[in-house]
Amino acid sequence: FTLDMGAAEGRPGMDFSPIAQLCREMEVPYTILGSEIQHIIFDVRKEKNPCSMCAKMRRGALHSALLERGIHKIALGHHYDDAVETFFMSLIFESRLSCFQPVTWLDRTQITQIRPLLYCGENLVRHTARRLSLPVVENPCPANGNTKRQEIKELIYELQGRYPGLKSRVFGSMQRLPLPEWGPVEHR
C-alpha cells in the first residue's frame, strides 16, 4: 500500500507510476490509497508543525485500509537514522526517552507493525536504491525540509562531526533502555 497524501476529490495525487510498474514486473500487488490528509493539515487546520498530526492521520488511514482487507501485518520503511532522530525528538520536544520499536503489536487494531529496515542506515538505503535502480518518489510535503525532524537531522549531523560514533552510541543506548523489543545487534 502507498498512501497518497494529496489525492482527493478532483485533485491529482503524486506520481507513483514508476513504483506501480516495478510492482507489476515483480508480480507484487500494489494499491494506492487516496486521502485528503494534505488538504486537512495545510488548508483546513493550517498546522504550523504538521508532522505529528499528519503521522497520526496517515497511520489511521493505513490501519483502516488494512482492516478493511483483513490484513493484520504491515512493514514500514523506518530506518536506523529515523530511529535516532525520533529518539532525539522525543527527548528534546517531549521530555521522554522513547522511540518506535522494531516490532509493534497494536492492541486496539490487532495489527503488527514491523520495520525491516531499522538496522539499515539512510545512506545504505539510498545507495542500494541507486545501485538497484529502484524508483524513488520524493517527499512532496509542503513542510519538507522545514520541520522539527529536519532540525534534529541537522543537529545530529553537527554532533556526529564533533563526536564520531554518536549515532551508533545513541542507537546502542536505545537497545539497552527498558524499551520492549529492543535488543543488541552485531552489525547494521
Q: Residues of each region from the PLM?
A:
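ATP-dependent adenylation/nucleotidyltransferase module used to activate substrates
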Residues: 1-85, 93, 123-131, 181
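Catalytic subdomain that performs nucleotidyl-dependent activation
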Residues: 73-74, 81-158
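Residues that form or immediately flank small-molecule/cofactor binding pockets and catalytic motifs
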Residues: 5, 35-37, 118, 141, ...
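The feature marks non-catalytic terminal segments
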Residues: 134-188
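Short, basic, helix/turn surface patches
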Residues: 54-66, 103-109, 156, 160-175
